[in-house]
Amino acid sequence: MSAQQVTLFTEQPLDLIFGGRLGQIDVAYQTYGTLNEDKSNAVLICHALTGDAEPYLSPVENQAGGWWQSFMGEGLALDTSRYFFICSNVLGGCKGTTGPASINPKTNKPYGSQFPKVTVQDIVRLQKALISHLNIPHLHAVIGGSFGGMQATQWAIYYPDFVDKVVNLCSSLTFSAEAIGFNHVMRQAIINDPNFNNGDYYEGEPPENGLSIARMLGMLTYRTDLQLAKAFGRATKNEGHYWGDYFQVESYLSYQGQKFLGRFDANSYLHLLRALDIYDPSIGFDNIKEALSRIKAHYTLVAVTNDQLFKLTDLHKSKTLLEQAGVPLDYYEFPSDYGHDAFLVDYDTFEPKIRSGLE
């Protein structure tokens, strides 16, 4: 079953944080489970940077499954026999929701370089419009990992009486200088690709080389040195090119870079990376404590101690800020060979924390 589609903001455009406006916004979304009679079991799932609206896919239709396939189903951490789950593709994405590759109704051409700047705050306001469209009066919980964790946090700030619980997996309240630096290098790889053309490449060749390189760097931040050592060590390829895929780890990264080209748009990657960099709960408030003090939801924060992207020190800072703001908080930390991506694949470790956070 493919994602469902709805067009929102058809009468009045959505005013964005940085001053842009978007109307006629297409939103791709999917639902799982059954909404109960009093509509009290709805849970919004917020996807990570390159995710989509379908965390679960029917094995009959797609053998690879969705990005949270092993976590979702009857009796699992994301229990479809108890909760009604909603997940939508984010604003600025390229998986069915309006983004830079979408057709601008004013020009009948892809937005490209004309697509406005988007923030996590804008993404959340579009999600709220979707929830209203679905006639859901209240959310039992909002859950997300990484970029999705930032969205979950913003939900609790913007709509404190609408959300009962927040589950934030592997995400701090703001991005670190080091992480912004990684994103800068990824952006430069794309922007300096000869095919980028200031983002207006849809009638020609896309900046595939730059996007592939960006993805390779990103993959290194999602993994751990121990994981790479176990998988590849210093093993070489039998016929590896001296300046290219000489080591097996290089071949793996090249494969991941090429694989990414078939499923993501370079402009969307640029916009969402910058939204990740810029996110700050204090936007629109005098300071971060004022923003966090609005949260009434019970907040579950989960950290992976050897996460290479959202470092433990930043999660500790986030924990302290939440506590100082009086947010009711459960905090967990533990190591995982999977590093930042643990929230997507390390079911045994994350299952009890997710289940507890949703209770």
From Swiss-Prot:
It is an enzyme of class 2 (transferase). It is found in: Cytoplasm. Keywords: Acyltransferase, Amino-acid biosynthesis, Cytoplasm, Methionine biosynthesis, Transferase. The active site is at 146 (nucleophile), 307, 340. It catalyses: L-homoserine + acetyl-CoA = O-acetyl-L-homoserine + CoA. The keyword Nucleus does not apply. Its EC number is 2.3.1.31. It holds the Pfam family Abhydrolase_1. Coiled coil: none annotated. One of its GO terms (biological process) is homoserine metabolic process. Its main location: cytoplasm. It comes from the Bacteria. Residues 41-346 form the AB hydrolase-1 domain. GO terms for molecular function: homoserine O-acetyltransferase activity. GO terms for cellular component: cytoplasm. Pathway: Amino-acid biosynthesis; L-methionine biosynthesis via de novo pathway; O-acetyl-L-homoserine from L-homoserine: step 1/1. PANTHER family: HOMOSERINE O-ACETYLTRANSFERASE. Transfers an acetyl group from acetyl-CoA to L-homoserine, forming acetyl-L-homoserine. NCBIfam families: homoserO_Ac_trn, PRK00175.1. Homodimer. This is Homoserine O-acetyltransferase.
